[in-house]
């Protein structure tokens, strides 16, 4: 989940430029996505998340022996190059889809929508990965792992958003 979880902060950090919706409105006269969803953010967020995943793959064999008493080391060596791309890219797609629906509901950019704001990227990462690499997803995200992710991710998400806000990369701390 680390590549998926870090894709969004990297998108915010390196984003800006041309909005994905090109500044256009939907048929409800509201922006399709808003200025916060840009091509540069999508590209660099996805690339950075993928690079983080690649780093995980490269380090896993070296870290596994030290974690042997805590987790099964074989869990650290099962990787997928498809998931390496789909997890961060899917995370950003999940955020984009959520933004689309927030605009339809009348939420402005930066408006808080609890739970959806924290778990949109998890849903996007899992859905895209399930569509393109279901075997890897189901092998790595058992029901207990999925529950743990759903419970833990919101805490990390809020912490990263507060950090982004304090660094001046986000307009709001959520």
Curated annotation (Swiss-Prot):
Domain of life: Archaea
Requisite cofactors: Mg(2+)
Pfam families according to UniProt: CarS-like
GO cellular component: plasma membrane
Catalytic activity: 2,3-bis-O-(geranylgeranyl)-sn-glycerol 1-phosphate + CTP + H(+) = CDP-2,3-bis-O-(geranylgeranyl)-sn-glycerol + diphosphate
E.C. code: 2.7.7.67
GO molecular function: CDP-2,3-bis-(O-geranylgeranyl)-sn-glycerol synthase activity
Compartment annotation: Cell membrane
Membrane topology: Multi-pass membrane protein
Disulfide-linked positions: none
Pathway: Membrane lipid metabolism; glycerophospholipid metabolism
Enzyme class: transferase
Segments passing through the bilayer: 51-71, 74-94, 112-132, 136-156
Keywords: Cell membrane, Lipid biosynthesis, Lipid metabolism, Magnesium, Membrane, Phospholipid biosynthesis, Phospholipid metabolism, Transferase, Transmembrane, Transmembrane helix
Function text: Catalyzes the formation of CDP-2,3-bis-(O-geranylgeranyl)-sn-glycerol (CDP-archaeol) from 2,3-bis-(O-geranylgeranyl)-sn-glycerol 1-phosphate (DGGGP) and CTP. This reaction is the third ether-bond-formation step in the biosynthesis of archaeal membrane lipids.
NCBIfam families named among the record's database cross-references: PRK04032.1 (NF003114)
PANTHER family linked: CDP-ARCHAEOL SYNTHASE
UniProt family annotation: Belongs to the CDP-archaeol synthase family.
Name of the protein this chain belongs to: CDP-archaeol synthase
Name of the gene this protein is made from: carS
């Amino acid at each position: 989940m680390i590549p998926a979880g870090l894709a969004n902060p990297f998108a915010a950090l390196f984003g800006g430029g041309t909005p994905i919706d090109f500044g256009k409105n939907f048929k409800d006269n509201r922006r399709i996505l808003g200025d916060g969803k840009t091509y540069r953010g999508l590209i660099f967020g996805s690339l950075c998340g993928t690079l983080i995943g690649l780093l995980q793959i490269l380090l896993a064999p070296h870290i596994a022996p030290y974690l042997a008493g805590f987790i099964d080391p074989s869990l650290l060596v099962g990787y997928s190059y498809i998931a390496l791309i789909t997890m961060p890219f899917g995370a950003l797609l999940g955020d984009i889809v959520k933004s689309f629906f927030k605009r339809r509901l009348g939420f402005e950019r930066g408006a808080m929508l609890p739970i959806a704001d924290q778990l949109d990227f998890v849903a996007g990462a899992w859905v895209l990965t399930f569509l393109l690499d279901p075997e890897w997803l189901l092998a790595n995200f058992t029901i207990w792992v999925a529950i743990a992710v759903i419970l833990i991710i919101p805490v990390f998400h809020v912490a990263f958003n507060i950090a982004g806000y304090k660094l001046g990369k986000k307009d709001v701390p959520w």
